[in-house]
Amino acid sequence: MGGAIARGLIKSGMCRPEDLICTAKSEATRSKIREYDAAIRTGSNNGAAAAEADVIILAVKPWHVTEVMGEICPGLDLGRQIIVSVAAGVTLNDLEQLAGTPSLEERVGGRSFPFFRAIPNTAVEVLCGVTFIAQHGATEEQIGLVCRLFSALGYALVVDEKLMSAGTALASCGIAFAMRYIRAAMEGGVELGFRPEEAARIVEHTVKGAATLLLESGAHPEAEIDKVTTAGGITIKGLNAMEKAGFTAAVIDGLKAANV
């Protein structure tokens, strides 16, 4: 996810490659980052990289957060830095505990350090992502900065932290759920007589068109469905067959199961 965010920030023009410092333990990972743009600075020293940064994005596996926070926290500067974690399941309270917030507050006159959680989905790399943002201790200016960063990668919204799990199910897991529909429709297209590559392009553009119609019109999905559904027609027959097989219930059940 860290690589996807970095590539998206560069692609959107929000950041210049030379403004980014990407750290990773593996040289193979660092090399892959530089292959995208040689101007991106890479390294393995998290503490040194964090000391230079205004915005520190923790894009590591949850079980690595404790180690990384231990490396970067001694040099944190409340006056100019914020931390944004995209580690799944790591709460704002967890971040505060790992940072040793009381000692930080002593250094900065009692103010709390600004922490953010961000849950982006993988489409941020193509600037069509969805990112949920929660925060604690941040100023309006800092909230605006983080929102601008992730809005450059698609759609970003600030939510209460208790909705982060639901957001993960709806948008992050939702990418996989949408892909499963696309795969099923592609297979159906092949059964109807199209070649696999033809079916793939048809379904991809159909889904893109459906989403674009909603985004540009602001209409409810049912209003767009009504436009192509006539009495006794083939669309209503197809919709009814899908509902008989439990389409809507299956989607809702999948979202609820993923909301843990």
Q: What are the language-model segments listed below?
A:
Residues 5, 9, 30-33, 68-72, ...:
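Hydrophobic packing residues within well-ordered alpha-helices of enzyme cores
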Residues 16-19, 79-81, 197:
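Short acidic capping loops at alpha-helix termini that bridge into adjacent secondary structure
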Residues 20, 30, 49, 65, ...:
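Small-residue helix-packing motif on alpha-helices
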Residues 21, 94-114, 130-166, 178-218:
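Internal alpha-helical scaffold of NAD(P)-dependent oxidoreductase catalytic cores
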Residues 204-260:
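NAD(P)-dependent Rossmann-like dehydrogenase/reductase catalytic/cofactor-binding core
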